[in-house]
């Protein structure tokens, strides 16, 4: 049977063994996951016996124009294969990532010594998601923010081209590559950075990144903060130092005065004659005058007596043993 799988296999083996007459250069096709792609085929052969499509080394579809027979080798491809407009161009739908590869088509005719072939290379790509942007090490010196932005895809898609757009300047700039070096000084007009990721079937944009937000730490530059801190601390420390020095001299002067005063007091105690009383330090008490009547002496009524100390003293011990009795004292020459 002309359309049996055994016959198709024999035709494919015969084609591989005998070689083929190439009709043209390799054609590259691009498709997206879930989409469709058409392998164009234009044949100049008037009488076509069969057309065989293969994927890598596996027969995919065989067409027999005379009987209008289309044989799909694998059942899973029956709903995916189509030949639009009644031609021989192959349309493959519901593309998968593993559909990427090399496709051949061979046109067999009794009028040709070798089959006419055409080679295709199919690349199936996924639609790109939003690219991710990461920031490298940031340096803030003198209010200038210097860092690198890196754009990448989370799933590592193939054949992705990255481009950066810098918006906000007089002329918008573009930068090719996944890494964008930036330098932005605090106080300048704000800038917006956007990463654009492209592949042959799609493109996507990152979220906009504001330089002011990215470099908000530049205003808090450690060096600038340190300078400001020094400018504030130096006068304060200098004032504290001067105050401490003044208090130290004052304390020292008071200690010296105290030592001198103590020495003077000690000298005055040892030699009182050397330290005459100073009028400045003398204090006087004022005694109020009281009216007192001074009695005049009356010689006629005055009694005078002469008291002589006894020549013999009593023994002190005997005085202790004597009872408390009044003693009679002898007075001589009482006038």
Swiss-Prot record:
<feature type="region of interest" description="Interaction with FYN when phosphorylated at Tyr-284">
    <location>
        <begin position="278"/>
        <end position="296"/>
    </location>
</feature>
<dbReference type="Pfam" id="PF07686">
    <property type="entry name" value="V-set"/>
</dbReference>
<comment type="function">
    <text>Self-ligand receptor of the signaling lymphocytic activation molecule (SLAM) family. SLAM receptors triggered by homo- or heterotypic cell-cell interactions are modulating the activation and differentiation of a wide variety of immune cells and thus are involved in the regulation and interconnection of both innate and adaptive immune response. Activities are controlled by presence or absence of small cytoplasmic adapter proteins, SH2D1A/SAP and/or SH2D1B/EAT-2. Isoform 1 mediates NK cell activation through a SH2D1A-independent extracellular signal-regulated ERK-mediated pathway.</text>
</comment>
<keyword id="KW-0812">Transmembrane</keyword>
<comment type="function">
    <text>Isoform 3 does not mediate any NK cell activation.</text>
</comment>
<keyword id="KW-1064">Adaptive immunity</keyword>
<keyword id="KW-0675">Receptor</keyword>
<dbReference type="GO" id="GO:0006955">
    <property type="term" value="P:immune response"/>
</dbReference>
<dbReference type="GO" id="GO:0042267">
    <property type="term" value="P:natural killer cell mediated cytotoxicity"/>
</dbReference>
<feature type="glycosylation site" description="N-linked (GlcNAc...) asparagine">
    <location>
        <position position="172"/>
    </location>
</feature>
<feature type="transmembrane region" description="Helical">
    <location>
        <begin position="227"/>
        <end position="247"/>
    </location>
</feature>
<keyword id="KW-1133">Transmembrane helix</keyword>
<feature type="glycosylation site" description="N-linked (GlcNAc...) asparagine">
    <location>
        <position position="148"/>
    </location>
</feature>
<keyword id="KW-0391">Immunity</keyword>
<dbReference type="InterPro" id="IPR036179">
    <property type="entry name" value="Ig-like_dom_sf"/>
</dbReference>
<feature type="signal peptide">
    <location>
        <begin position="1"/>
        <end position="22"/>
    </location>
</feature>
<dbReference type="GO" id="GO:0002250">
    <property type="term" value="P:adaptive immune response"/>
</dbReference>
<feature type="topological domain" description="Extracellular">
    <location>
        <begin position="23"/>
        <end position="226"/>
    </location>
</feature>
<dbReference type="GO" id="GO:0042802">
    <property type="term" value="F:identical protein binding"/>
</dbReference>
<feature type="topological domain" description="Cytoplasmic">
    <location>
        <begin position="248"/>
        <end position="335"/>
    </location>
</feature>
<comment type="subunit">
    <text>Isoform 1 binds to SH2D1A when its cytoplasmic tail is phosphorylated in the presence of FYN (in vitro); low affinity binding, the physiological relevance of the interaction is questioned. Interacts with SH2D1B; in NK cells.</text>
</comment>
<feature type="glycosylation site" description="N-linked (GlcNAc...) asparagine">
    <location>
        <position position="98"/>
    </location>
</feature>
<dbReference type="GO" id="GO:0030101">
    <property type="term" value="P:natural killer cell activation"/>
</dbReference>
<keyword id="KW-0399">Innate immunity</keyword>
<dbReference type="InterPro" id="IPR013106">
    <property type="entry name" value="Ig_V-set"/>
</dbReference>
<feature type="glycosylation site" description="N-linked (GlcNAc...) asparagine">
    <location>
        <position position="204"/>
    </location>
</feature>
<feature type="glycosylation site" description="N-linked (GlcNAc...) asparagine">
    <location>
        <position position="142"/>
    </location>
</feature>
<dbReference type="GO" id="GO:0007155">
    <property type="term" value="P:cell adhesion"/>
</dbReference>
<feature type="domain" description="Ig-like V-type">
    <location>
        <begin position="23"/>
        <end position="124"/>
    </location>
</feature>
<feature type="disulfide bond">
    <location>
        <begin position="151"/>
        <end position="195"/>
    </location>
</feature>
<dbReference type="InterPro" id="IPR015631">
    <property type="entry name" value="CD2/SLAM_rcpt"/>
</dbReference>
<dbReference type="InterPro" id="IPR007110">
    <property type="entry name" value="Ig-like_dom"/>
</dbReference>
<protein>
    <recommendedName>
        <fullName>SLAM family member 7</fullName>
    </recommendedName>
</protein>
<feature type="short sequence motif" description="ITSM">
    <location>
        <begin position="302"/>
        <end position="307"/>
    </location>
</feature>
<keyword id="KW-0472">Membrane</keyword>
<keyword id="KW-0325">Glycoprotein</keyword>
<keyword id="KW-0732">Signal</keyword>
<feature type="glycosylation site" description="N-linked (GlcNAc...) asparagine">
    <location>
        <position position="176"/>
    </location>
</feature>
<keyword id="KW-1015">Disulfide bond</keyword>
<feature type="domain" description="Ig-like C2-type">
    <location>
        <begin position="131"/>
        <end position="206"/>
    </location>
</feature>
<keyword id="KW-0393">Immunoglobulin domain</keyword>
<feature type="disulfide bond">
    <location>
        <begin position="145"/>
        <end position="215"/>
    </location>
</feature>
């Amino acid at each position: 049977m002309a359309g049996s799988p055994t016959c198709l296999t024999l035709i494919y083996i015969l084609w591989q063994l005998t070689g083929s007459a190439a009709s043209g250069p390799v054609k590259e096709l691009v498709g997206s996951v879930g989409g469709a792609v058409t392998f164009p085929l234009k044949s100049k052969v008037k009488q076509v016996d069969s057309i065989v499509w293969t994927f890598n080394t596996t027969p995919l579809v065989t067409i027999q124009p005379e009987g209008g027979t289309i044989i799909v080798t694998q059942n899973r491809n029956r709903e995916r294969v189509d030949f639009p407009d009644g031609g021989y161009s192959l349309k493959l739908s519901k593309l998968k990532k593993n559909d990427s590869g090399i496709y051949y088509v061979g046109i067999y005719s009794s009028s040709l010594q070798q089959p006419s072939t055409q080679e295709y290379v199919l690349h199936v790509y996924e639609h790109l998601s939003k690219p991710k942007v990461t920031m490298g090490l940031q340096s803030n010196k003198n209010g200038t923010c210097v860092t690198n932005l890196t754009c990448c895809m989370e799933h590592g898609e193939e054949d992705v081209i990255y481009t950066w757009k810098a918006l906000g300047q007089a002329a918008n700039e573009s930068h090719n590559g996944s890494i964008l070096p930036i330098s932005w000084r605090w106080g300048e007009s704000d800038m917006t950075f956007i990463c654009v990721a492209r592949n042959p079937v799609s493109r996507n944009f990152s979220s906009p990144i504001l330089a002011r937000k990215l470099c908000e730490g530049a205003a808090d530059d450690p060096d600038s903060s340190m300078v400001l801190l020094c400018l504030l601390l130096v006068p304060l420390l200098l004032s504290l130092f001067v105050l401490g020095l003044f208090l130290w001299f004052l304390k020292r002067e008071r200690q010296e005065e105290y030592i001198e005063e103590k020495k003077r007091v000690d000298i005055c105690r040892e030699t009182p004659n050397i330290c005459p009383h100073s009028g400045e330090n003398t204090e006087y008490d004022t005694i109020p005058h009281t009216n007192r009547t001074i009695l005049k002496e009356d010689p006629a009524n005055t009694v005078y007596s002469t008291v002589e100390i006894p020549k013999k003293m009593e023994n002190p011990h005997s005085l202790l043993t004597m009872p408390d009795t009044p003693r009679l004292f002898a007075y001589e020459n009482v006038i």
